Amino acid sequence: MTKIKSKYQVGKLIYGVVEAHTPFGVFVDIGEAEVKGLIQITDFLDTGSMTPEMYPEIGSSVGSVVVGYTEDERNQVWLSVKPSVLQKSLVKLKLPASTQI
């Protein structure tokens, strides 16, 4: 099992800071120099269309759920902030759905 896979298990709730916008999503600093979080544009909303203009501001904090990762030289943890994915993670933690992240 790789370091990324063992530390950032799918379904884990993590926090980070938005550090860059791209046409395909945002990169998130998750507190580890050699690993970057990535929220792809398709992992923001359950329904409707997300556009880069709607991204959270650079420097803002985000709570997200690990949905995958790369095991190559990119060292990326794929994240989601979709309400349905966050809800499932909060239920696993037995936190009320109204908990702000």
How would you name each of these model-derived features?
Residues 1-101:
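Single-stranded RNA-binding regions, centering on S1/OB-family and related RNA-binding modules
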